[in-house]
């Protein structure tokens, strides 16, 4: 009972802090709230999921693979880390006309080649999976594009709410976090079609990464034993990955390991690993 009161109190304090901080944020840095910005009448939205008659007040994303299965669903005896770099090429179109209903028969505002795979760990087995994709040019080189008003980048996440039946948890908490810290991932609701079949409501999200418009840190110079860094709590890999020696691992406080995502495995040194671990 006491722990429940503590958790409730922390949530209330977090909400109050976000409210107070939002009143003092520079208007130019005010986080865009998608649900407060759309004025198209919801009743005009078609309830049909047929691509010929479908329409939505939300952005619509169409992905075409030519019938090729998107890789990433784990098979029997296969480790998640074995397939995290398996991508296929596909075509993506995004329909996002401000003040209009979005239809697949309309002119897309964005059209690009992408490399795409299924993302997640246990969520890879869900009926509705999430995706990670990267914009590319016709030659397969990554390129940065603006998506639904969010900062340009090449790598994006399509989160498919499955266990969260409200469909709001990640969208709500990312936006709330963004009112407190501007580097929290930006998000937009959208509706997704895959090879002409409706997949449901998704959340288009920025991937947590170092760079302009994402987490803007001091770039590692490759020489110093001190660096800005990003770590990821993840399941242990079967690959040769050096994990951090830290309290969470030897005290078994989390079911996973902490892996350095930036500066990255190819640039990490024993001295830098020790610095980050401390």
State each model region's role.
Residues 2-278:
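Phosphate/dinucleotide-binding and metal-coordinating scaffold of catalytic cores
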């Amino acid at each position: 009972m006491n722990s429940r009161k503590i958790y409730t109190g922390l949530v209330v304090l977090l909400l109050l802090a976000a409210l107070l901080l939002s009143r003092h944020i520079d208007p130019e840095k005010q986080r865009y709230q998608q649900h407060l910005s759309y004025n198209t009448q919801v009743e005009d939205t078609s309830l049909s999921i047929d691509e010929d008659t479908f329409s939505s007040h939300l952005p619509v994303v169409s992905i075409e693979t030519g019938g090729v299965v998107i890789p990433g669903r784990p098979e029997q005896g296969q480790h998640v880390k074995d397939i995290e770099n398996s991508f296929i090429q596909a075509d993506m179109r995004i329909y996002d006309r401000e003040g209009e209903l979005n239809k697949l028969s309309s002119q897309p505002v964005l059209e690009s080649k992408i490399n795409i795979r299924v993302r997640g760990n246990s969520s890879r087995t869900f009926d509705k999976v999430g995706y990670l994709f990267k914009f590319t040019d016709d030659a397969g080189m990554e390129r940065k594009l603006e998506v639904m008003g969010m900062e340009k980048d090449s790598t994006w996440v399509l989160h498919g709410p499955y266990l969260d039946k409200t469909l709001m948890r990640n969208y709500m908490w990312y936006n709330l976090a963004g009112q407190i810290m501007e580097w929290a991932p930006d998000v937009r609701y959208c509706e997704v079609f895959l090879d002409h079949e409706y997949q449901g409501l998704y959340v288009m999200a920025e991937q947590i990464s170092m760079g302009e418009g994402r987490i803007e840190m001091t770039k590692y110079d490759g020489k110093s034993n001190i660096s800005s860094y990003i770590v990821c709590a993840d399941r242990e890999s079967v690959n040769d990955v050096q994990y951090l020696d830290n309290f969470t691992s030897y005290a078994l406080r989390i079911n996973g390991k902490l892996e350095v995502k930036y500066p990255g495995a190819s640039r990490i040194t024993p001295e830098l690993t020790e610095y980050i671990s401390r």
